[in-house]
């Protein structure tokens, strides 16, 4: 008796969305220099799903449809993995940005505890202290950009959270991290040349800063391990050094260095940029600003006190209306991937256009209107409000960043009067990876 032959079902035929005919080099340049403008123009012409061909990422499908974004974010990493290349070019192969599938899952489980729940409450006093220290230098009665101050605050906060104390080594990190992040952010959107043009070239400068960073890290790790109270320390470095994976193994020295660099860089620039936008926005909305001050004042003093519903809603709306990181990406692993009506072949990447979804009037009515009331008494959709990305690769530090922004805003509102302005909103400025207010989130303040 012959056996029946089971034929596996045929894969659906590839069906791609419309693609721009612009030259590949022009697409790459526009994507690197002005993604928001480019994506908005192409979405008007082709709709919420269209294809690009970028020098760095290759063939890409851009998705600005919330339901399709939800599908992408809820698809497992076996089908949709990490885009290549990624920010591991800046942070190293041991960074969470470099990892995929099970390696990525293991690392996130190890990193999550310091940045969630009760753990982040331990950092509130540090944030308030650093905010008061930095804002003591603010001028009164004259315009100044808040972004540099926010960069200082968020860098100092993450340094203290990671290492637990000060010292000469942290002063060295304060010296090298800001220019490293600024240059790295610009280069991240550009292909890396095959040839090394020396230590005075942009990529050579990044390599030199990395060499200096590794020397500092060796000293900090040695000092941490030698601390008689090492077992009781609560800083992130100590937690990493003591942590083990499920199989009992520990993070390597290189992986710890790469991961801490990721936290230092990604953990301060994006939060600082959002805070700069927050001051730019509230200074142009007098009624909102007055209500925020009343909320902060009525809450009483002390870092653990007080209601913050309006302040939280304002932070949510800043992240929607002035999205700092405007895309999240995945790479197709199976022979084909069905995305709505489209069938995407292996090797393609998919970019979720966060900014375009945040501007969608079907999801956020009158999206150009800055209105924190959207979130009073309700939570935004986890697949439409997506400043931290979504799914398995959502930012592991999202809760920490939200708490940090809340404490910084509350502290400033309690100690300063922010003058309102009817000046036009500041333009968007692309720093490579992040978007900041072009003039740095300028405000005028007076001490209360």
Language-model segment annotations:
Residues 2-100, 106, 121, 125-133, ...:
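N-terminal membrane-proximal hinge/A-helix region immediately C-terminal to the signal-anchor transmembrane segment
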Residues 352-378:
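Conserved cytochrome P450 K-helix/beta-meander segment immediately N-terminal to the heme-binding cysteine loop
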Residues 270-295, 399-414:
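Cytochrome P450 catalytic-core helices
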Residues 28-47, 301-340, 361:
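Conserved cytochrome P450 K-helix E-x-x-R motif and the immediately C-terminal K′/meander segment
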């Amino acid at each position: 008796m012959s056996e029946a032959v089971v034929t596996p079902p045929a894969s659906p035929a590839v069906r791609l969305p419309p693609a721009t005919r612009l030259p590949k080099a022009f697409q790459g340049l526009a994507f690197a220099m002005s993604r928001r403008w480019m994506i908005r123009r192409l979405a008007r012409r082709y709709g919420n799903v269209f294809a690009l061909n970028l020098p760095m990422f290759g063939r890409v499908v851009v998705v600005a449809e919330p339901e399709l974004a939800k599908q992408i974010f809820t698809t497992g990493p076996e089908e949709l993995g990490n885009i290549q290349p990624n920010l591991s070019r800046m942070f190293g192969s041991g960074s969470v940005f470099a990892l995929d599938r099970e390696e990525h899952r293991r690392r996130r489980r190890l990193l999550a505890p310091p940045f969630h729940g009760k753990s982040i409450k331990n950092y509130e006093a540090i944030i308030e202290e650093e905010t008061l220290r930095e804002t003591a230098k603010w001028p009164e009665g004259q315009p100044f950009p808040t972004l540099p101050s926010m960069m200082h605050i968020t860098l100092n906060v993450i340094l203290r959270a990671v290492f637990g104390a000060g010292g000469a080594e942290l002063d060295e990190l304060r010296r090298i991290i800001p220019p490293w992040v600024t240059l790295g952010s610009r280069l991240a959107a550009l292909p890396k040349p095959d040839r090394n043009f020396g230590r005075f070239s942009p990529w050579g400068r990044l390599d030199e800063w990395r060499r200096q960073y590794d020397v500092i890290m060796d000293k900090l790790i040695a000092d941490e391990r030698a601390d008689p109270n090492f077992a009781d320390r609560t800083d992130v470095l100590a937690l990493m050094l003591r942590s083990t994976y499920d199989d009992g193994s520990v993070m390597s020295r290189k992986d710890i260095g790469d991961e801490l660099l990721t936290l230092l860089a990604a953990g301060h620039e994006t939060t600082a940029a959002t805070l700069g936008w927050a001051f730019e926005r509230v200074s142009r909305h007098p009624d909102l600003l007055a209500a925020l001050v009343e909320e902060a004042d009525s809450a009483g003093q002390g870092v653990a006190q007080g209601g913050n519903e309006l302040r939280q809603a304002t932070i949510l709306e800043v992240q929607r209306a002035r999205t700092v990181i405007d895309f999240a990406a995945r790479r197709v692993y199976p022979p084909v991937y069905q995305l709505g009506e489209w069938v995407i072949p292996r090797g393609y990447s998919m970019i979720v256009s966060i900014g375009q979804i945040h501007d969608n009037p079907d999801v956020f009515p009158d999206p150009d209107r800055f209105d924190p009331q959207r979130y009073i008494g309700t939570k935004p959709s986890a697949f439409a409000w997506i400043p931290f990305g979504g799914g398995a690769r959502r930012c592991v530090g999202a809760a920490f960043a939200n708490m940090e922004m809340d404490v910084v805003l509350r502290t400033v509102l309690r100690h300063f009067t922010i003058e309102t302005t009817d000046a036009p909103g500041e333009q968007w400025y692309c720093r490579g990876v992040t978007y900041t207010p072009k003039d740095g989130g300028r405000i005028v303040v007076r001490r209360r």
